[in-house]
Amino acid sequence: TGSVYNFVPIGNAADNRRALNLLMEGNEKKVININNNIHIDTYLRPGNNTTINAGKHTITSDKGVIINDPTAASYTNFKNLTINGGIWKNSSSSGLAGTMMRISYASNISINNATVYTNYKGHGIELISCSNVVVNNCTLKAQGKCSKTCVEEQLQIDLSSPTTAPGLYRLSKKLCNGTPCKNITVKNCTIQGARGICANFAGAGNEAKYRKARNYHSNITIENCNVTGISAEAIALFNTKSTTVKNCRITTKTPKSRNSYSVGLAVAYQKGSAPKATTKNVISLTNNTVKGGQQGIFVRSNASKKLGTVIVSGNTVSAKKGKKNAIKVLSAKKVKITKNKTKKW
């Protein structure tokens, strides 16, 4: 069963953080119960096999709240972290313009019933090169002012490259080898940001070597979520070869003049060499209510290969640009578009 600790705040923010980190470090199985509102000065650094039960208590940090520093480019480098509950926020009312929870090279991660506040320029949760992650019944909400051109997401699903993960690059260049995420599930969540949820891709130029088939995310599931984008897409899944988005309310408030940023739900391969176009790679978008600008749902490949199977079924989809622009699927090997309601918004 491991050790169980009931944490009591012991003084100032730095002392609280040090004491919690002493309880959380190491690989043995442990449960930390946070039974009070607490103030910390910077990130908590849990070890493997850690459960944090924060209930309805508020954890306020002068920086971010959860981070791990990987020592090897392996999904199993950090494992078995569960966070239950908690209202996690920065001490500034406009939130942290950075990442609140950054988890990298990790597997078997579970974040449940947590509320995370972050500035529009930041990320509530950033998953870099992770496998087998569940984010369930969480609220991720941006704070402060959102610029008209902000494209940062509250939930970021990332690969490890020098530009996508500069924090890892500072730790070790070996950590930035382009490892993608796989088996990521987001369910029963409410997410609002400049972007809501984004699966990221590496930039052009020097980063082109991270735009290969091996760098593509896979098995991303978004289910029963309410996701809103204020100045970019509500959901944008780039370089993701297999995904399921179902039973979600997806709304982009971005004006249609922002073109592709105003799409409600976007799935796109970016320029580069993509995975082989096989019907086994399925993009399934079903039973969602989607509101967008230029398009509601937009699926396409700008890469060397087509997408695999694309299913768009049972959705109610609106586009500010008109009914005929509600759903657009381009460049897929097999396409099934059925039983959708489309309208002008």
Q: Could you say what each language-model-derived stretch is?
A:
Residues 21, 28-70, 88-92, 114-116, ...:
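N-terminal extracellular ligand-recognition/capping segment immediately after the signal peptide
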Residues 16, 33, 53, 68, ...:
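Polar/charged side chains located within well-ordered beta-strands of beta-rich proteins
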Residues 42-46, 60-77, 95-105, 123-129, ...:
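Glycine-rich beta-solenoid repeat tracts in large extracellular/virion proteins
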Residues 309, 313-345:
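Leucine-rich solenoid repeat scaffolds
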Residues 77-79, 108, 219-221:
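Leucine-rich repeat
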Residues 5-33:
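Acidic Gly/Asp/Thr-rich repetitive segments characteristic of extracellular carbohydrate-active
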